[in-house]
């Protein structure tokens, strides 16, 4: 059992982790930027460490500052929440070198599945159906434009390290592609510290239904059922509905197998 956990996040997810720590009699340490000193998560935690200025790249995304804070307070584990450093394999390896447990997947799994472009490639190699699009990462707008022209518009430009609707843009024609790509890339760099992109065929009026799998390091694995996340704003989920009204019992039985 951990004695002290540093929470490398902010907002609602940090508050939830703090509550879980309290229920388990584990000391919680919040980190905050200079702009978040009075935020709820900073007030609720047993300890709070300010790790830098307001921009995320200088605070929540600064791996050395986050890890330095954990070492300074004597935390034996770091919980990343979601977003920020939660799918950064380099950060996981840094934690391992400092003998601090990263609460989440191993660096090897994140390398394969944490990066969405790499995850697409892994699934394609395994024969799993995916939305038509690129198999490899796209680094330059001109390269992506040629791919999109061949694929046909509209296309969705996505950040490989993306999440929470960040770094996603729909492009409807070749003339707008370079500007749209660069806008999405800049947003991804600011949000995740990674401007690598990939491209998919844009699907209009889709249903977004997820099946979440949870496993521990001992090999115990469960699924948590389906969640319909189709109601979104700016590509970010607003409501998660379970069970989904859009999938039949027959389809569910096939997927659960």
What do the PLM-derived regions correspond to, one by one?
Residues 1-254:
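N-terminal beta-alpha lobe that positions the nucleotide/phosphoryl donor
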